[in-house]
Amino acid sequence: MIQKETQLNVCDTSSVWVVNTFHIYRGFRHRIGRLGDYIKVSIRSTKPECTIKRGKKKKAIIVRHAFGRLKRDGSFSKFSSNVCVLLKKRTAPLGREIKGPIFYGVKKKKFVASFPGRV
């Protein structure tokens, strides 16, 4: 579960390592973001050759979080870290490819990028 001021890793090839959450697009009373939710982030750490500077604001989508999730078939999935993908537009990722497994519920959000794995 992602709240405001949560730091997340980035799993695409946009040369950004760490971002900080400051807004969750979920509704007025919802303070916690879950898998597949859109968030607004600020860039905290980048590679030296990156064109995106520290402090810039971007939109992102949550693709993994450390809080466990019970699936409909009864299995339990849990990731080791909180991870997001930076977005250019509402559905276009900033990097060319996405690294690591992605939760299958993100595909239901009509996210047009092809994902490497399914969990």
Swiss-Prot record:
The keyword RNA-binding does not apply. The lineage of its organism: Eukaryota, Sar, Alveolata, Ciliophora, Intramacronucleata. GO terms for cellular component: mitochondrion; ribonucleoprotein complex; ribosome. It comes from Paramecium tetraurelia. Its main location: mitochondrion. Keywords: Mitochondrion, Ribonucleoprotein, Ribosomal protein. One of its GO terms (biological process) is translation. Pfam families: Ribosomal_L14. Belongs to the universal ribosomal protein uL14 family. The keyword Ribonucleoprotein applies. It comes from the Eukaryota. SMART domains: Ribosomal_L14. PANTHER family: 50S/60S RIBOSOMAL PROTEIN L14/L23 (PTHR11761), LARGE RIBOSOMAL SUBUNIT PROTEIN UL14M (PTHR11761:SF3). This is Large ribosomal subunit protein uL14m.
